[in-house]
Design a protein with these regions (language model features):
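N-terminal interaction/assembly modules
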Residues: 1-169
């Protein structure tokens, strides 16, 4: 199973939690159990290959992370979805964007561009081309603003250090 497939599987689990309200650990352990997984493989090709231990750890990390930070992630989506209320965005699209923003902020080995392009690819696959454009717009704006926030924080930190060094002299 590729990382892209593991990401898609994680989206399925995040989306499923929207309906069940189950604890993230419970969702991952139940849905990835051998017996349950075998049933799912008959319904969707994404389940044809079981995830490795590393992929299972990634899936567990992102599903739990998105669940634990849902309010924060939704606030970021809301900030950049001008003219749209988060509650009006389809649950699947919201799940895709939550995962992408979580990956950008908290998963170090996932480049920002990969998180955005994978979310767009999955949005097009499940919700159509228009949704892919919508997701690309929101996540692209989020990523650019994040770069600005990071550079400003670095600049400000450097400024404080310089002021302290001057004060010490």
């Amino acid at each position: 199973m590729t990382r892209a497939n593991a990401r898609e599987l994680a989206v399925h689990l995040i989306y499923g939690r929207e309906f069940t309200g189950e604890e993230p650990e419970q969702v991952v352990s139940i849905r990835l159990a051998k017996e349950y997984y075998a049933k799912l493989s008959q319904e969707n090709d994404i389940y044809s290959e079981r995830p490795s231990r590393a992929q299972t750890a990634y899936i567990d990390k992102v599903v739990s992370g998105v669940a634990n930070r849902a309010e924060e992630l939704n606030a970021e989506i809301q900030k950049y979805s001008i003219g749209w209320d988060v509650s009006r965005i389809s649950r699947l699209t919201r799940s895709l964007m939550q995962l992408a923003i979580y990956e950008i902020l908290f998963v170090e080995d996932v480049p920002t561009g990969v998180a955005v392009s994978e979310a767009v690819r999955l949005a097009k696959k499940y919700d159509g081309d228009d949704t892919g454009s919508f997701v690309n717009g929101i996540l692209g704006t989020f990523a650019r603003s994040l770069q600005y926030r990071i550079s400003w924080n670095c600049y400000y930190s450097l400024y404080i250090i310089m002021r302290l060094l001057i004060a010490i002299r």
